[in-house]
């Protein structure tokens, strides 16, 4: 939001994560612009939340979960011409995430590593 996003949707399956996100948003004075809710990729796609896709999607989840989410529609959240930033990936799991993303016609545009952890940016 502070970098110019008009709307932001934060979704997690864990209600405590949503509580923490709300507190962080209020601390950073962006609470009113942020939509938060408990849900899943499938629930986003069927319209439980105000929008079903975005130009930028961010997921900070362990690699095996990211791979499963690609099978559950994660790539469908990305608007045409958009990107997804994936983090929470161990270096040795990078290949499996790349393969899952490429199977959904995403292309890696950037990656970064810090210690054993990797973050990938994929584009549609």
Predicted regions and their residues:
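Conserved SAM/SAH cofactor-binding pocket of Class I
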Residues: 1-40
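Short alpha-helix immediately C-terminal to the canonical SAM-binding loop
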Residues: 18-19, 66, 94
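A short glycine-rich, Lys/Arg-flanked "PGG" loop and its adjoining helix->strand segment in the class I
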Residues: 70-83
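Active-site capping/gating segments
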Residues: 89-124
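Conserved SAM/SAH-binding loop
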Residues: 37-46, 117
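A short acidic, Gly/Pro-enriched loop at the edge of an enzyme's catalytic core
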Residues: 42-56
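Residue-level signal for inorganic ion chemistry
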Residues: 21, 62, 101
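A short SAM/SAH-binding and catalytic strip from SAM-dependent methyltransferases
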Residues: 55-68, 88
